[in-house]
Amino acid sequence: PTVVCLLAATVVIWWGSLDNGFHYDDEHSIQLNIHLRLAPDLGEMKDGIKSYFSDPSTFSRDAKKGMYRPLLVSSFAFNHAANLAFGLDGYDVRGFHVINILIHAINGLLVCWFARLLWPSRKQIGLVAGLVFIAWPLGSEPVNYISSRSESLAALFYLLTMALYLAAQTDRRQRTYWACWLAMGAGLLTKSTTI
């Protein structure tokens, strides 16, 4: 019931943002970025994603604004290809907002898990923490502003890193510790502020 409650709350609170348009950095990093224009074809996606990991200039149409954020750029390209696969325009903003809302929901679930790991005897604290995170007005930027996905996706991996570390303290399995490092690495490949 906790997962369903948090997912439902996210949808109810943020569904109204689906038709919000692109703005600010969305123009150079998404709308005019030819590197994101991938068809829903596995070969083309593979080549595109490979280029995001080897060429920071793929971050923007303006090579001077290049940043090394391959997982973020991959998520934008995936959005473009998924929009096409669903019969939408590749740059239909609704597809981008659906992914941002999904990332926000996952972050709420991770906050819940993290709180439950901190206070294992008080399970309701996790639900409350997750709901507060999901509903907090400051969370509107990463949901409404597509380019701010860098913040929410980096937060996803950061929260996952912290939760896995706490989980590793109790289960003492080496693979949980290694999963911490993988999550941290994914965060760094999304945005360097994950450090």
Q: Model features per residue range: what roles?
A:
Residues 1-195:
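Polytopic membrane enzymes that build or remodel cell-surface glycoconjugates and lipids
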